[in-house]
Each structure stands twice: as structure tokens, then as C-alpha cells.
Regions:
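Short glycine-rich anion-binding loops that position phosphate/pyrophosphate groups of nucleotides
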Residues: 48-50, 74
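Preference for short coil/turn "hinge" residues that link or interrupt alpha-helices
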Residues: 23, 28-31, 45, 117, ...
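Rossmann-fold NAD(P) dinucleotide-binding segment
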Residues: 29-40, 50-67
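Residues within well-ordered alpha-helices
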Residues: 18, 56, 80-81
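Glycine-rich phosphate/diphosphate-binding loop of Rossmann-like nucleotide-binding domains
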Residues: 1-39
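Solvent-exposed, flexible loop/coil residues
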Residues: 8-14, 34, 42, 56, ...
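Short, well-ordered coil/turn residues at beta-beta hairpins
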Residues: 44-46, 71
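Adenosine-phosphate binding glycine-rich loop
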Residues: 61-174
Length: 174
């Protein structure tokens, strides 16, 4: 809890320096290096688009990653993403699904504003959880329907396309 509290304090104060955290808690810090060489069960690239290339993807996989969660918008090149998805035991959560939470929260805020409502934090969280669970379920079901197993990237692409196509057809746009 102390470490999380310190991270929250750093974030809110604008002192987002990893070095400060490393010094306070006595952990290794590698200035100027990217984290892809560190052994980890969970990897969450969250900086910028196309930051993870094939070389880094191979390094990440070799280090035993189990969950690769794209927090940034498309942080992984297509080649690297395909490689990670092909690795046994690696689950890839695609950025379009992961980042939907931020978009959904904005939509919930707009809904509150347009109806002049005020929801509690718990109500917003419950609605957001439902939306994110639906996205996950739709992604899994789409991947399974098209024989793609547990490929969340393909499932999210298919489910997203299907929703847009259905909306266009409902509007008479072909």
C-alpha cells in the first residue's frame, strides 16, 4: 500500500520520475533503457504508438510474459503483435478494447450532463464494468465464431466491425 500511495502522490504532484521511486524503495533503475528486457508476467506498454517492434517482442516473449496488455494506442507494430499472439501461453489484450474504458467513461459523462444527472462513483464504475465486460464477451464470442480460438485482437476487430456495419445498415447506409 505504501508503494501505491507513493505512486499516486508522484502522479498527482507531477513528479512522475521512475528514478525517485527506485531510490525511495531501493529497486533497480536503468536510466535511458526501455523495460522490455525485464522478466515479467504482465507487460503493459503505455507510452506511444509503435514503441514495441519485433526485436522487443521477441525479448518480451523470451522473458516469459503471460499477459501483454496494450495500454497506449497501438503501442505495438503489426509484425510484433502478430509474433506475440503466436506465442503459446501469451494472452494479448488489444489497445482498441483496453482503451475503450476511457471512451466509455467520456460517454457516460456526456450522458449525465445531457440528462442533468449526477451518478455516484460506484454507479459510474458499475456501468463502466458492464461496458468493459460486454466488450470482452463480444471479442471472445467473435473470435470463437470465426474459429480463431482465444484471439482477443481478431475478436475485437471483428466485433467492432460488426457493430459499425450493423449501425450503418440500420441507418440505410450500405
Amino acid at each position: 500500500e505504501e508503494k501505491i500511495a507513493y505512486l499516486v502522490e508522484m502522479r498527482s504532484s507531477g513528479r512522475n520520475r521512475v528514478q525517485d521511486y527506485a531510490e525511495k524503495f531501493g529497486v533497480e533503475f536503468f536510466p535511458g533503457e526501455k523495460p522490455w528486457g525485464v522478466k515479467a508476467d504482465v507487460v503493459m506498454p503505455s507510452a506511444m504508438q509503435n514503441d514495441v517492434h519485433m526485436e522487443q517482442a521477441k525479448q518480451i516473449a523470451a522473458n516469459g510474459v503471460k499477459y501483454y496488455i496494450e495500454v497506449a494506442n497501438m503501442p505495438t507494430t503489426n509484425e510484433a503483435l502478430s509474433y506475440l499472439m503466436s506465442q503459446p501461453g501469451v494472452i494479448v489484450a488489444p489497445s482498441k478494447a483496453v482503451n475503450a474504458g476511457g471512451v466509455a467513461t467520456s460517454a457516460l459523462e456526456m450522458a449525465q450532463n445531457s440528462e442533468r444527472l449526477v451518478w455516484t462513483e460506484e454507479e459510474v464504475d458499475q456501468r463502466l464494468r458492464q461496458i468493459m465486460n460486454n466488450i470482452y464477451t463480444m471479442s471472445v464470442e467473435a473470435a470463437e465464431k470465426y474459429g480463431l480460438g482465444y484471439n482477443l485482437v481478431a475478436g475485437a476487430n471483428i466485433a467492432g466491425f460488426q457493430r459499425v456495419a450493423d449501425a450503418m445498415m440500420a441507418q440505410g447506409i450500405f
